[in-house]
Amino acid sequence: MLKAYVLIEAEVGTAVKVVTLLKAIDGVLSCDLITGGYDAMLIIETPDMITLSELLNSQLRTIPGVLKTITCVAIPR
């Protein structure tokens, strides 16, 4: 399995709604509101990089209120 951490920047006033919608996506293990330069952080697990890419492009980034994402893929040990 491939694990990734995703930082989300949301439009002002939409962070709570965005997090609620993100939690409903299959493959999202956790999603929390955070402090700092971003509004939320997700932990995602997918079978492979292709599935991760599809999840990010067709589901996550299409949620109303999502302005920007940064994805960090975990390096297996």
Regions found by a protein language model. Give the residues of each.
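A compositional/biophysical signature of low hydrophobicity enriched in polar/charged and small residues
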Residues: 1-77
